Amino acid sequence: MTTSTASADKALNQAQRPVVQALMAALPKGTVILGGAVTERSAGIWRSDQIQAQVLVRPKTTEEVSCALRICHEHHQSVVPHGGLTGLVEGALTQPLDIVLSTERLNVIEEISASERTMVVQAGVMLQSVQEAAASEGLMFPLDLGSRGSCTLGGNLSTNAGGNRVIRYGMARDMVLGLEAVMADGTVISSMNRMIKNNAGYDLKHWFLGTEGTLGIITRAVLRCREEVTTAPTALVAINSFDALVAFLKQLDRGLAGNLSAFEVMWQNFYQLVTQPPAPNQRPLQDDAAYYVLVEAMGAAQEQLEAILEQALEAELIVDAVVSQSSQQTDQLWGLRDDVAQTFQFSPVFLFDVSLRLSEMARYVDAVNAGLAARFDAPKNFVLGHVGDGNLHFAIAVGGDSRAQREGVEAAVYEPLKAIQGSVSAEHGVGLEKKPYLHFVRDEAEIQLMRTIKAAMDPRGILNPGKIF
């Protein structure tokens, strides 16, 4: 034991000493880190605080994950899994007596099969690295998020991430053929299926997809890729009414014959925010329209998209449009949609991720804004989202972040959502932040079944305790 490790060991809570000693004895040197080397780490890339846990385990193999969890299970020790820490719902927050299990060293892309269009990837690999590796073999991994350069595959799968192309390719779970996960007692479930069709018994991967590390820790996955797309015409479109927006979406769906891969909508105030100083972005269209839609059509010809836009202009569904003429222009258009960080100039900002039926969307946004105006002076609500799949994001600033202000903002967002049977979490998960509102979406029988499953798979409740319900 080094001097620094010995010093950190002295600072450990007495109750943790036996489990830490067991972990350090069983795992390779450098796998377990203690004290300041842990607490100096950020609790999340969107947060200003640090990890509260004093102990962090960094396994390099599934066997090491299994060993660590077996020891923690024997000692009734709580474990919080960490990936890229890009989550927005406090799903990876720790308490002082927790142990963090980081997937940062599970970072190998093990195999790519161009003929079978599959990849075998460890949980700590960044999403962007997965995308780039697929492209190097003439493939595409369709999952895409603004945090692609920071988020990890394990986190994407454990939260069932959505992103920009759900309208065509589905959620993260739709891109997984098989996976490997370690249960609370160290049991390894190696369900590394490589077939698209496999109805032999329960599809066990779904116990770990979207369950936020509460039932097991994902270590590896078999991903389903697609053939690389050589064309992806992209346009930014200005629209003045939500009814016209819905009609335009239908026209695109019909005209592109299944090639519509993104339909991202920015409300006027968000578009103005990201195209005016201090934002560095250029303004491709005037900012006086009600909505701005980023359209992407993977696999379509540019002429096909341009013809649909001309028809929409003639039908007065849209008022203006610009079609990208280069990859640089495409990146600039996507840069507008991804520049959510501009909202932080009004910090503190409350971020929301909701889903609802398209037919309710315009009225719902009006109801949220009315609720905010009734509760606060001069609130700001920047609205954008994956409208093509019914997902909205809000960035709301009310001049503070006291408990009363947070509760007021949440009431303005969630109460009208409950009335129309929407979801408080479209793609970010539940974590701690949305836990009080789970009953808005799930009835008591559903929540009780979740508890029953949790008790069966993690009887000592050590995995990511307190999250979801």
Model-flagged regions — what are they?
Residues M1-R70, G87-R117, G146, F270-Q282, ...:
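N-terminal flexible segment immediately upstream of the FAD-binding catalytic core
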Residues K29, A419-V430, P459-L463:
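Alpha-helix capping/hinge segments and adjacent helical runs
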Residues L34-S42, L223, A238, A244-A412, ...:
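C-terminal substrate-recognition/cap domain of FAD-linked oxidoreductases
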Residues V108-E264, L463:
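FAD-binding subdomain of flavoenzyme oxidoreductases
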Residues T187, K435-F469:
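Activity-critical C-terminal alpha-helical subdomain
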